[in-house]
Amino acid sequence: MSIFVDIEKNFGSFRLKMAFAAGNETLALLGASGSGKSMTLKCIAGIVTPDRGRIVVDDVVLFDSEKHINLTPQQRRTGLMFQNYALFPNMTVLQNIRAGAGREPDKKKREAAVAAVMDSFGLTSLADHLPSQLSGGQQQRTALARILVSNPRILLLDEPFSALDNHLRFRLEQEVRQTIRDFGKTVLLVSHDRDEVFRLADSIAVVSNGAMDAFGTKSEVFHNPQTRMGAMLTGCKNISPIQVLDATHVRAMDWDMTLEVPEIPADVKAVGIRMHDIRPGQGKTAFRCRVVGEIENPFSYTVMLQASPSATAVGWEMNKEYWQINRREEIEVCMPPEALLLLKDEMKEVLR
């Protein structure tokens, strides 16, 4: 199972230009609101028509502007689940799921498939309920069942947990993970939640301003996001523009720190460090900083450190016990070279 996408769509003030490929895996499109993630899924599903390009799923050409191919949404067999699930409000659970099985001409096979998927998702006892009578989790399971009963070529999940309360998300995330495993084909997951993406996806495409900003396995993207946007979306809150001093040293201008770094790639414009990667310490890579604030989190402290009066404060996260024992007005910290993220403004070429 695979997907290939290379499309462009001009919306006037916004231009979508997406190019990526994925195999039999879960690929997450990680980006901020309005970055083009959901629009990409709509183009794949046939709801929005690109201006140019090509979309292929499992060697079936869904769209090709040069060859004038543009299959209907029904012909594409893409299983798109919207953020709000888009259940028919005046139809029961059973009727909603039957609507998804409409392509099967044999009535007995169609009813057997509906019964099987309802049993699989624990919906049999809710067959006569309307969507308004269901919990958020039951609505999600109904939407997934309606999609899967149609035997789609690919599963497209658009912010599948955004409509759920926090206390429901983790449990339902486990159910979706199992659904993905059972599906066994290509899955595209749209999200702005880095933790959700890391738990569910195999690979990550960072999306910014309608285009791919970074691409790789989830480990690659989190350990080396490569761009400012990639670093921010994967949770790095300490980012500073730099001045390159020599082959192994840069000046973090916002932080007023000279940092030792690994080999510096071309076009690097900024440096970042995750809050939990800062270390207490002494020596040539240490900086004496003034504590200018502390934030108590449920299970940790974030301490704001300033290397000079004019510098931007850097956030350092540590467990509560450490800070309660070592709380002080000034402290020496290290920025380990191996923990520093060397960042470009954007990627000139995205790996596919």
Identify the meaning behind each predicted range.
Residues 4-26, 30-32, 38-39, 46-49, ...:
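Non-catalytic connector elements of ABC transporters
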Residues 38-41, 141-142:
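ABC ATPase nucleotide-binding domain helices that frame the ATP-binding cleft
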Residues 42-43, 203:
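The short alpha-helix immediately C-terminal to the Walker A/P-loop
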Residues 54-76:
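ABC ATPase NBD Q-loop/coupling interface
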Residues 77-79, 83, 90-229:
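ABC ATPase nucleotide-binding domains
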Residues 222-247, 272:
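C-terminal boundary and immediately downstream tail of ABC-type ATPase nucleotide-binding domains
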